[in-house]
A protein has these predicted regions:
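Compositionally biased terminal segments of proteins
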Residues: 1-138
């Protein structure tokens, strides 16, 4: 017989994003190789984290129950990952993905994560915002 399998909401959310053509293209076009293994580049991963945060925030605003830790985790991950960017990266992305990044950055800029709260030294919240803008909103 068939046995139902519980899939974590975070995995389900990521799967839904991957079914989107624009995000699938983002995944394919921003692959890198690490020791012969295909991985997603940092600049390619950040839009997925931002989109997950946007989707979860919209579900929460619509009255659905969402895991608050998951919402904050995606936002914090964007901050952590942004500290790895130099600012000159130019990820291949569609206008739809760019529009999502613009929406995310508008929300993020009004309430940025303090890198110090994530134990990241030597980088301020405004520097994170600026590098994200230079990479995704150029």
């Amino acid at each position: 017989g068939l046995m139902p399998i519980h899939i974590d909401d975070e995995v389900s959310n990521l799967s839904a994003i991957l079914l989107d053509d624009e995000y699938y293209r983002l995944l394919v076009e921003n692959r890198a190789s690490a020791s012969g293994v295909a991985v997603l580049s940092v600049e390619g991963l950040i839009p997925f984290k931002a989109k997950a945060w946007l989707d979860l925030s919209a579900r929460r605003a619509g009255g659905q129950a969402v895991d608050e830790k998951s919402v904050e985790k995606h936002r914090n991950d964007v901050c952590r990952l942004a500290t790895l960017l130099a600012g000159g990266e130019r990820p291949a992305m569609s206008e739809g993905v760019r529009a999502d990044m613009r929406r995310f950055l508008e929300a993020y800029e009004s309430d940025p994560v303090d890198p110090k709260a994530l134990k990241i030294k030597g980088v301020g919240a405004q520097q994170v915002v600026e590098v994200l803008k230079s990479v995704y909103l150029r």
